[in-house]
C-alpha cells in the first residue's frame, strides 16, 4: 500500500520548477521459511526536486534531495537515510527525450551509487514508451480518450532496516 503525491511549483514563467513529492508506504512480507508469518515494513519519504531549464530549452538539469525512512519499526536508531539524484535531460525532438544521471543514497550498509538512464518517446499519437532505469519502464497504448492499456515494469531497489 502506498500513498504519494507530487506538488509542482512553477518558476521563471514555467521554465523551471520545484517539486515536492511526499510519500508513505507499507509492505507486507510473508515468508515460508518463517511458517508463512507476515511482517510489516514501513517507508516515509520526502523528495525535494529543482528543475532548471538551460538556455537553449533542449537541456535541463534536475537535482533532487531525498530524505527517507525505511524500517520495520520507527523505534530503531539511525533509520533516516539521505540521498540525492542528478539528472540531465535532453529534448532531441518534440517526440523524443532522454535522460542520464546518477543516484546516491546513504544506505544502512554504506554509500550506494546507481547510474540512471531514461527515455520519454511519443512513438505516435496513441503509443508512448517512458521510464527511468533502473526503476521503471512503461509502454502505454491509448485505446480512446478515456482508456489506456500497456505494460509497466517496476524494479524494486528498496532496502529496509530490520
Where are these regions (language model features)?
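Hydrophobic alpha-helical segments and helix pairs
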Residues: 53-101
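Transmembrane beta-strands of outer-membrane beta-barrel pores
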Residues: 22-30, 52-54, 67-73, 104-108, ...
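Repeated loop/turn-to-beta-strand initiation elements of outer-membrane beta-barrel proteins
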Residues: 12-18, 56-61, 95-100, 126-129, ...
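Flexible, solvent-exposed coil segments and beta strand-coil junctions
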Residues: 25-30, 62-67, 94-98, 112-122, ...
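Residues that define the transmembrane beta-barrel architecture of outer-membrane proteins
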Residues: 1-3, 38-44, 76-82, 111-115, ...
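Outer-membrane beta-barrel translocator/channel fold
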Residues: 10, 22-44, 133-162
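Residues on the lipid-exposed face of transmembrane beta-strands in outer-membrane beta-barrel proteins
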Residues: 3-9, 44-52, 84-90, 102, ...
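Transmembrane beta-barrel domains of Gram-negative outer membranes and organellar outer membranes
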Residues: 1-72
Amino acid at each position: 500500500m502506498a500513498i504519494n503525491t507530487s506538488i509542482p511549483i512553477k518558476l521563471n514563467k514555467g521554465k523551471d520548477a520545484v517539486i515536492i513529492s511526499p510519500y508513505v508506504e507499507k509492505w507486507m512480507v510473508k515468508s515460508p521459511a518463517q511458517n508463512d508469518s507476515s511482517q510489516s515494513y514501513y517507508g516515509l519519504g520526502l523528495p525535494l526536486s529543482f528543475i532548471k531549464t538551460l538556455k537553449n530549452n533542449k537541456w535541463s538539469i534536475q537535482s533532487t534531495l531525498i530524505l527517507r525512512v525505511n524500517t520495520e519499526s520507527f523505534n530503531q536508531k539511525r533509520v533516516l537515510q539521505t540521498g540525492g539524484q542528478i539528472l540531465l535531460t535532453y529534448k532531441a525532438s518534440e517526440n523524443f527525450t532522454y535522460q542520464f544521471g546518477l543516484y546516491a543514497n546513504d544506505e544502512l550498509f554504506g554509500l550506494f551509487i546507481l547510474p540512471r538512464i531514461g527515455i520519454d518517446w511519443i512513438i505516435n499519437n496513441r503509443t508512448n514508451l517512458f521510464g527511468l532505469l533502473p526503476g521503471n519502464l512503461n509502454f502505454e497504448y491509448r485505446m480512446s480518450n478515456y482508456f489506456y492499456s500497456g505494460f509497466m515494469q517496476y524494479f524494486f531497489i528498496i532496502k529496509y532496516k530490520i
